[in-house]
Structures are given as structure tokens and as C-alpha cells.
Amino acid sequence: MKTIALVLFILVFGMSAALAFDVNPYHKMVKKLVRNNFKSIEEHRPEEIMDGVSDKTLEHSFAGDNSLSGTRHDKESLLRWFKRVNKVLPELKFEITDIQVKGGPSNTLVIARWTATCHLLNGEPYENKGVHFITLKWGKAIKFDVYENTKVVSHGLEVQYQAGILEAKAPKIES
């Protein structure tokens, strides 16, 4: 009886410790994937992100009222959107400040907080804090909700437009 109690204690303690210290292997893998995807955006390799996006169900929403805002429901539009980000803010870098992962492979919620920085073409520094809420199902992203300071985005796009990047004021990419 003591052996059973000891085994149960070890299992419960071990699971509690794993949850407390976030050693869930699936969650670690998802965090690494998210960091790699932000790096792909920085390095102008948006095609690499598309393998992790659902072919069937997709919703990508970026808050605001500018050339980057709106909602996309297909991979082709999402890829064009990522390419636009790279064109209008070519030096954009992300510092991921926190990633939280909840759930298992059949329904995963990722919350990624970040600070985006670059220098605009007029030399002005650009800094914007934001958060992604990403829903994954069986390894594929099905929903992205992106929130940031929309005034900062709009100002940055206006500066880039004035410096000659006409796509900074192009119509939204929506589908």
C-alpha cells in the first residue's frame, strides 16, 4: 500500500512540477515554431510560414484601418500580406517578450507578445508592441488575431509612403 501511495505521490508531484515549469514537450515545440515563424518574417521568407497554415479553414485579422489591416481567409492572400509587410517595413524585427501555449494538438491557443522595431526610411525609429492570438489544430494555424497600436502602424506606413513606398497606402489585402 505504501508503494502505491508513493507512486501516486510521485506521479502527481511530477505532473504538477511539469505544469508549473512548462516542460510540456508539445508546448515547447509550439513555442519554437512561433519564434521561427517570426524569424521567417524578419528574414523575408514568408513562404516558409505557409506550410504551417491550414488549407481549409483560415482567418487572419490585423487590426486597424491601413494597407496592412483587414481579414484574410485563404493562403494566397495571407502570403501576399506577408510579402507586403516585408516591402513596406523591410527592416522590421521582432523581440518576442512572452509566449503562452494552452491546450493540446487538437485545439491549441498560442498567445505571443512582441515588440516590433525598425527604422523608417526618413530615419525615424519605429516601435510597436502587440500580441498575436493564434489557434492551431493538428499542427496547422487556422486563426490569427493580431493586435497592435494601430496609430503607430498607420504613422509608419504614412512615413514609408512619403518616402516612396507606394504600397504602404495600397488597398487592404482581404479575402
Question: Model regions: which residues?
Answer:
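A solvent-exposed, acidic/Ser-Thr-rich amphipathic alpha-helical stretch
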Residues: 47-103, 108
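A beta-strand edge to alpha-helix "cap/lid" segment located at domain peripheries
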Residues: 21-25, 29, 85-175
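Hydrophobic pocket/interface hotspot
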Residues: 37, 49-50, 58, 78, ...
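Intrinsically disordered, low-complexity regions enriched for glutamine and histidine
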Residues: 42, 57-58, 130
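Short, low-complexity N-terminal intrinsically disordered segments enriched in polar/charged residues
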Residues: 4-52, 163-175
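Short, mixed-charge, low-aromatic patches
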Residues: 32-42, 68-72, 88-91, 113, ...
